[in-house]
Protein backbone atom coordinates (compact mmCIF):
# COMPACT_ATOMS: atom_id res chain seq x y z
CA UNK A 1 0.00 0.00 0.00
CA UNK A 2 2.79 2.43 0.95
CA UNK A 3 4.60 1.71 -2.32
CA UNK A 4 1.45 2.46 -4.30
CA UNK A 5 0.92 5.74 -2.44
CA UNK A 6 4.57 6.75 -2.89
CA UNK A 7 4.42 5.99 -6.59
CA UNK A 8 1.11 7.76 -7.01
CA UNK A 9 2.35 10.84 -5.15
CA UNK A 10 5.66 11.14 -6.96
CA UNK A 11 4.31 10.40 -10.43
CA UNK A 12 6.98 11.28 -13.02
CA UNK A 13 9.85 11.16 -10.52
CA UNK A 14 9.25 7.45 -9.90
CA UNK A 15 9.25 6.74 -13.64
CA UNK A 16 12.48 8.72 -14.11
CA UNK A 17 14.20 6.93 -11.21
CA UNK A 18 13.11 3.56 -12.58
CA UNK A 19 14.50 4.37 -16.03
CA UNK A 20 17.81 5.48 -14.50
CA UNK A 21 18.06 2.24 -12.55
CA UNK A 22 17.25 0.17 -15.64
CA UNK A 23 20.06 1.86 -17.61
CA UNK A 24 22.65 1.41 -14.86
CA UNK A 25 25.66 -0.58 -16.08
CA UNK A 26 26.59 -3.04 -13.35
CA UNK A 27 29.52 -4.70 -15.18
CA UNK A 28 32.78 -2.77 -14.77
CA UNK A 29 35.11 -5.35 -16.31
CA UNK A 30 35.12 -8.96 -17.46
CA UNK A 31 38.19 -11.18 -17.85
CA UNK A 32 39.09 -14.85 -17.48
CA UNK A 33 36.26 -16.42 -15.44
CA UNK A 34 35.39 -13.19 -13.62
CA UNK A 35 33.05 -10.24 -13.82
CA UNK A 36 33.69 -7.14 -11.73
CA UNK A 37 30.39 -5.55 -10.75
CA UNK A 38 29.42 -2.20 -9.30
CA UNK A 39 26.34 -1.50 -7.28
CA UNK A 40 24.16 1.52 -6.77
CA UNK A 41 24.24 2.89 -3.24
CA UNK A 42 20.96 4.71 -2.81
CA UNK A 43 20.94 7.17 0.04
CA UNK A 44 24.71 7.72 0.18
CA UNK A 45 24.28 11.43 -0.42
CA UNK A 46 21.96 11.69 2.57
CA UNK A 47 24.50 10.21 5.02
CA UNK A 48 25.97 12.54 7.59
CA UNK A 49 29.57 13.71 7.26
CA UNK A 50 30.49 11.47 10.22
CA UNK A 51 28.96 8.43 8.50
CA UNK A 52 30.81 9.20 5.26
CA UNK A 53 34.07 9.60 7.20
CA UNK A 54 33.49 6.21 8.83
CA UNK A 55 33.00 4.60 5.41
CA UNK A 56 36.17 6.27 4.16
CA UNK A 57 38.24 5.00 7.10
CA UNK A 58 36.79 1.50 6.80
CA UNK A 59 37.75 1.40 3.12
CA UNK A 60 41.27 2.61 3.98
CA UNK A 61 41.56 -0.13 6.62
CA UNK A 62 40.49 -2.71 4.05
CA UNK A 63 43.22 -1.49 1.69
CA UNK A 64 45.83 -1.84 4.44
CA UNK A 65 44.62 -5.35 5.23
CA UNK A 66 44.81 -6.28 1.56
CA UNK A 67 48.61 -6.53 1.56
CA UNK A 68 48.47 -8.73 4.66
CA UNK A 69 46.13 -11.11 2.84
CA UNK A 70 48.37 -11.12 -0.24
CA UNK A 71 51.35 -12.00 1.94
CA UNK A 72 49.49 -14.73 3.84
CA UNK A 73 48.34 -16.38 0.61
CA UNK A 74 51.90 -16.81 -0.74
CA UNK A 75 55.23 -15.23 0.14
CA UNK A 76 55.80 -14.23 -3.49
CA UNK A 77 52.42 -12.55 -4.01
CA UNK A 78 53.48 -9.04 -3.01
CA UNK A 79 56.73 -8.95 -5.02
CA UNK A 80 54.96 -10.44 -8.05
CA UNK A 81 52.00 -8.05 -7.78
CA UNK A 82 54.27 -5.03 -7.35
CA UNK A 83 56.46 -6.05 -10.29
CA UNK A 84 53.44 -6.63 -12.52
CA UNK A 85 51.96 -3.29 -11.47
CA UNK A 86 55.26 -1.58 -12.29
CA UNK A 87 55.28 -3.24 -15.72
CA UNK A 88 51.63 -2.33 -16.28
CA UNK A 89 52.11 1.35 -15.44
CA UNK A 90 55.54 1.72 -17.05
CA UNK A 91 55.01 -0.27 -20.24
CA UNK A 92 55.97 1.75 -23.33
CA UNK A 93 55.06 -0.80 -25.99
CA UNK A 94 51.86 -1.63 -27.83
CA UNK A 95 49.14 -2.28 -25.24
CA UNK A 96 47.14 -4.26 -27.81
CA UNK A 97 49.99 -6.78 -28.20
CA UNK A 98 48.59 -10.21 -27.20
CA UNK A 99 51.49 -10.69 -24.75
CA UNK A 100 50.66 -7.45 -22.94
CA UNK A 101 46.92 -8.18 -22.98
CA UNK A 102 47.67 -11.58 -21.40
CA UNK A 103 49.86 -9.90 -18.76
CA UNK A 104 47.06 -7.43 -18.00
CA UNK A 105 44.55 -10.27 -17.59
CA UNK A 106 46.97 -12.14 -15.33
CA UNK A 107 47.48 -9.01 -13.20
CA UNK A 108 43.72 -8.49 -12.89
CA UNK A 109 43.33 -12.10 -11.74
CA UNK A 110 46.10 -11.55 -9.19
CA UNK A 111 44.32 -8.44 -7.92
CA UNK A 112 40.97 -10.21 -7.68
CA UNK A 113 42.26 -13.39 -6.02
CA UNK A 114 44.72 -11.61 -3.70
CA UNK A 115 47.55 -13.56 -5.24
CA UNK A 116 48.69 -15.98 -7.92
CA UNK A 117 46.21 -18.73 -7.01
CA UNK A 118 42.56 -19.00 -8.02
CA UNK A 119 40.25 -17.59 -5.36
CA UNK A 120 38.16 -20.82 -5.10
CA UNK A 121 40.10 -23.72 -6.60
CA UNK A 122 43.40 -22.40 -5.16
CA UNK A 123 45.31 -23.69 -8.21
CA UNK A 124 48.03 -21.43 -9.56
CA UNK A 125 47.08 -19.25 -12.53
CA UNK A 126 48.64 -20.16 -15.86
CA UNK A 127 50.00 -16.98 -17.47
CA UNK A 128 49.22 -16.36 -21.14
CA UNK A 129 52.47 -14.44 -21.66
CA UNK A 130 55.98 -15.84 -21.97
CA UNK A 131 58.87 -15.68 -19.49
CA UNK A 132 60.86 -13.80 -22.14
CA UNK A 133 58.17 -11.12 -22.44
CA UNK A 134 58.10 -10.62 -18.67
CA UNK A 135 61.91 -10.54 -18.46
CA UNK A 136 62.07 -7.91 -21.22
CA UNK A 137 59.35 -5.78 -19.62
CA UNK A 138 60.92 -5.91 -16.17
CA UNK A 139 64.37 -5.05 -17.50
CA UNK A 140 62.93 -2.02 -19.32
CA UNK A 141 61.24 -0.47 -16.29
CA UNK A 142 64.36 -0.29 -14.15
CA UNK A 143 65.37 -1.32 -10.66
CA UNK A 144 63.88 1.66 -8.83
CA UNK A 145 60.33 0.60 -9.77
CA UNK A 146 60.79 -2.99 -8.56
CA UNK A 147 60.43 -4.53 -5.09
CA UNK A 148 64.06 -5.66 -4.92
CA UNK A 149 65.59 -6.82 -1.65
CA UNK A 150 68.75 -5.07 -0.52
CA UNK A 151 71.60 -6.06 -2.83
CA UNK A 152 69.33 -7.95 -5.23
CA UNK A 153 69.76 -7.25 -8.94
CA UNK A 154 66.95 -7.11 -11.49
CA UNK A 155 68.27 -10.32 -13.05
CA UNK A 156 68.25 -12.11 -9.67
CA UNK A 157 64.71 -10.87 -9.01
CA UNK A 158 63.46 -12.16 -12.38
CA UNK A 159 65.22 -15.49 -11.80
CA UNK A 160 63.52 -15.77 -8.39
CA UNK A 161 59.94 -14.98 -9.44
CA UNK A 162 59.92 -16.66 -12.89
CA UNK A 163 59.61 -20.25 -11.63
CA UNK A 164 56.88 -19.18 -9.21
CA UNK A 165 54.89 -17.65 -12.08
CA UNK A 166 55.67 -20.05 -14.93
CA UNK A 167 56.58 -23.49 -13.51
CA UNK A 168 53.34 -25.39 -12.84
CA UNK A 169 55.08 -27.58 -10.24
CA UNK A 170 56.34 -24.66 -8.10
CA UNK A 171 53.78 -23.55 -5.49
CA UNK A 172 51.07 -25.22 -7.56
CA UNK A 173 48.32 -24.93 -4.95
CA UNK A 174 47.70 -22.35 -2.23
CA UNK A 175 46.48 -24.93 0.29
CA UNK A 176 47.23 -28.59 -0.33
CA UNK A 177 44.72 -30.85 1.38
CA UNK A 178 45.84 -34.23 0.08
CA UNK A 179 46.82 -36.52 2.93
CA UNK A 180 49.78 -38.14 1.15
CA UNK A 181 52.17 -35.15 1.45
CA UNK A 182 53.37 -32.76 4.13
CA UNK A 183 50.50 -30.27 3.97
CA UNK A 184 52.51 -27.31 5.23
CA UNK A 185 55.52 -27.80 2.97
CA UNK A 186 53.41 -28.58 -0.09
CA UNK A 187 51.14 -25.54 0.33
CA UNK A 188 52.06 -22.16 -1.11
CA UNK A 189 50.43 -20.20 1.72
CA UNK A 190 52.73 -18.16 3.92
CA UNK A 191 51.35 -18.70 7.42
CA UNK A 192 54.38 -20.57 8.71
CA UNK A 193 57.37 -19.06 6.92
CA UNK A 194 60.23 -20.78 5.19
CA UNK A 195 61.75 -23.82 6.86
CA UNK A 196 58.95 -24.32 9.38
CA UNK A 197 57.69 -27.89 9.55
Please name every model-derived segment.
Residues 1-3:
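Sec-dependent N-terminal signal peptides
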Residues 5-8:
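C-terminal motif of bacterial Sec signal peptides marking the signal peptidase cleavage site
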Residues 10-13:
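Bacterial signal peptide processing site
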Residues 16-18:
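N- or domain-start disorder-to-order transition segments that initiate the globular core
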Residues 20-197:
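N-terminal helix-rich structural modules
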Amino acid sequence: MTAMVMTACTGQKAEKAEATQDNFNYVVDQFADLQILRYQVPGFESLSLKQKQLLYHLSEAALMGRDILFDQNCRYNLPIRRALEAVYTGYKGDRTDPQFVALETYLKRVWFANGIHHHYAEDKFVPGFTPEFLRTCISQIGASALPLREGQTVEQFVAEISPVIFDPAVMAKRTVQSGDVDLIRASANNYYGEGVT
